[in-house]
A protein has these predicted regions:
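PLD/PLD-like phosphodiesterase catalytic module centered on the HKD motif
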Residues: 1-173
Length: 173
């Protein structure tokens, strides 16, 4: 596959949001989970990442599809599909609800959480794609703040990022 790259600038002035880009990446992970999926962000809220209010994603969820899917649910579903999910965030109470929900919903041997007080990077990275930029995975980051987010599929960027992330924080095994 030829590498593809798209940078978007989100915020109230642009009227652009990152929702569809993030949803597409997570749906791809539902279908074919990466061996390792990395989420790195100092601030994480259990944001809704898929709106299934009109049933567009019913086939992904089985017999009782939810109206929506939160980030912790999406990552847990991906971990149940075989991915080892790595989360690097700050050890701040703000991130607590998200982390508790993720740990409760995912198989324990498929989740690796690192808390780093100095983390400032914002990245979501699978086997052959990476989403990175200035956006925290929070309501403000996704819907209110002016942000710059780049999505790259194919090429060497994701592989290099996964190597760098594993070197910095290990793989939790």
């Amino acid at each position: 596959m030829r590498p593809k790259e798209r940078t978007i600038r989100t915020g109230p002035r642009t009227g652009v949001r990152v929702d569809s880009m993030l949803s597409a990446a997570l749906i791809a992970e539902f279908i074919t989970p990466s061996d390792h999926l990395w989420l790195v962000s100092p601030w994480i809220t259990d944001i809704q990442v898929l709106d299934n209010g009109h049933g567009a994603y019913d086939a992904l969820f089985g017999d009782v599809p939810p109206q929506g899917c939160r980030l912790s649910d999406a990552l847990a579903r991906i971990s149940h599909g075989g991915a080892r999910v790595h989360v690097v965030t700050r050890g701040d109470a703000h991130n607590g609800d998200f982390l508790r929900r993720l740990v409760k919903a995912a198989p324990p041997n498929r989740i690796h959480i690192e808390q780093d007080p100095n983390i400032h990077e914002k990245t979501l990275c699978g086997i052959d794609w990476i989403l990175s930029g200035s956006m925290n995975f929070t309501v403000r980051g996704m819907a209110k703040n002016d942000e710059s987010v780049t999505y790259k599929a194919g090429g060497a960027s994701a592989a290099q990022a996964r190597l760098d992330l594993a070197q910095r924080w290990g793989d939790g095994e």
